Structure formats: C-alpha cells, structure tokens
Regions:
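Cytosolic juxtamembrane amphipathic/interface segments immediately preceding
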Residues: 1-2
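A structural signal for multi-pass alpha-helical bundles of membrane permease subunits
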Residues: 6-294
Length: 294
C-alpha cells in the first residue's frame, strides 16, 4: 500500500472528528474573534465595529493588570505547594506498611469529588461563626476570636490556595506514585549498601525517574490553575474587594455581569492566548526532553 494512500486514508479517518471540532470549537472561536472587535452588549443590538479598542482597554486597564497579578500568584503558590505535597505523599505511599491501600484510596477522594462539593466543604470549614478551622485555632490558642477567612482581603486568597491544593495534590501524587513504580528496587538497594542517605537517594536515584512525569504534572496544573474559575466562584465569587478575582472570573463578570459581550470576548481571547503560550512551552519542553532521551 503506497504512502500517499496511507496518508489519504488517515485524513479520511480523522475527517469526522475534524468536522466535530470545527463545529464545536472552530465556529464559536471565529464568532468570538469577530465579536471582540465590536462594542456589542449581551442583549440588544449587534454593536458597532471598534477595532482593537477592546484589547487596548483590557490590557491597559488596572482591573486586568491587578487580576493578572492575582492569577499569577495563585497559580505559582498553589502549583508549587501541590507539587511538594504530592511528591511527599507519593514517597510515603510507596513504602510498605499496613493500611497502605486504604490510604491510597482515601488520598484520591478530594480529587475525585466534584469541585463544587470541595468548595462547599471548605466554605463550611472557614465559616466565621461555626467553622472547624476557627474552633481548632481557638482551642490551641492561636487566635482569640473567630475570623472570616474568606471575608478578609488579607486571608481570602491564601484560604483559596489551601482549598485548591487539597483538591489537586492527589493528581500530582498519583502521577509521582506511578513513576515511582518504575524505579528498580535493586538500584535503590545498591544505594543503601553504598551508604546513600535519604536526600542523596532521592536526588540521584529517585528524582531522575520522576523528572519527566513531574514536568507533565507541573505544566498541566499550571495551565489549570491559570484558568481556574469554579472553586473560586463558589467560595468567594472573586471577593472580597476583588482580592481573589482571577482572569476567568473577570471574563465572566465582563461578559455576563456587566453584559459587555465585546469586551468579554476580547478578554477571553487574551486569556486563551496566554494559556496557549503555556501549552506551547509545554510542547517545547516535551520535545526537548524527548531529544535528550534519544
């Protein structure tokens, strides 16, 4: 069978999927691009053509800049914490001890639960009147009065980061745990015989096997954290005083709360471009890793 026919056959097999992708992704994207160059409202007339004014106003506006900083801090801190906690949990659950299977199953639970459920549970924990966190901190003497952790600008973002880490660190742990299964036990045993300590054993024996999978987890979690919406919307709706407003929430507010469809479309495309840059960086890292391995 000729190479040309194989290529044609491959495209024919992919054609139904391409049609679906164009219908579901392509056309709405084209429509959004067109909408972003207008001053259209969510209801009413189609709006007038304004060129790149929406993009200029969005990028140069203080709301966008503050929100971008908040989103970046949220992504950096939450992903870093998830990576550290996830790797530590994987190393712990890779040991042989009674009840390991039960702990592995329980660890998956926060990640398996719907985000709305997780967010609701954490709202109850942070509740300023009867929340478990306030009660525990009062018992050990760290606070002398109940606090509104989600109602104060100084603590709201940190409280959200904790909830997000709780939700997503199991994914990192599962990826790391799967990679740990590939570490040869004879190599680990040899390092023990050679007198390698825990840190040296992790650095020179275990980490090389974890590097590739952890890079995948790092990039995927960074992309997800950068476009986070659901857990923040359920817990704070971007408040108080916009201290927890992320880019995705700003897009929602611009398009639906303020009913500025044109501005919302331009902002959505800006966020899409930022996330695409992260995806391109991920692809470049994968190619570089594959080239190094070859």
């Amino acid at each position: 069978m000729s190479g040309t026919w194989m290529t044609v056959r491959a495209w024919l097999l992919m054609l139904p999927l391409l049609v679906v992708m164009i219908a579901v992704i392509g056309w709405p994207l084209v429509d959004t691009v067109g909408l972003s160059f207008t001053d259209a409202k969510l209801v009413g007339t189609a709006g007038n053509l304004v060129g790149i004014d929406n993009y200029v106003k969005m990028v140069s506006g203080s709301n966008f800049q503050r929100t971008l900083i908040t989103t970046t801090w949220f992504a950096i801190i939450s992903v870093a914490a998830e990576m550290v906690i996830g790797v530590f949990a994987a190393l712990l659950l890779n040991q042989d001890f009674r009840g390991r299977a039960v702990l592995r199953a329980l660890m998956i639970l926060p990640w398996a639960l719907p985000t709305v459920v997780n967010a609701t549970l954490w709202r109850l924990i942070y509740n300023p009147e009867y929340g478990a966190l306030n009660a525990a901190l009062m018992q050990i003497g760290l606070i002398d009065a109940y606090r509104s952790w989600l109602g104060e600008p100084g603590t709201a973002l940190g409280a959200l980061i904790v909830a997000d880490c709780w939700k997503n660190f199991p994914l990192v742990a599962l990826i790391a745990l799967a990679a740990l299964q590939a570490v040869p036990r004879d190599v680990t045993a040899a390092s023990l015989v050679d007198g390698a300590g825990p840190f040296a054993r992790f650095r020179f024996v275990i980490l090389p096997y974890l590097a590739g999978p952890l890079m995948v987890a790092l990039v995927l979690r960074t992309i997800e954290a950068f476009k986070v919406f659901d857990i923040i919307w359920v817990m704070t709706r971007g408040g108080p005083a916009n201290s927890t407003r992320t880019l995705s929430i700003l897009v929602y507010q611009e398009a639906f709360s303020f009913q500025r469809a044109g501005s919302g479309a331009s902002l959505a495309l800006i966020v899409t471009m930022l996330v695409t840059l992260l995806a391109v960086a991920y692809a470049a890292l994968v190619r570089k890793s594959a080239g190094s391995a070859a």
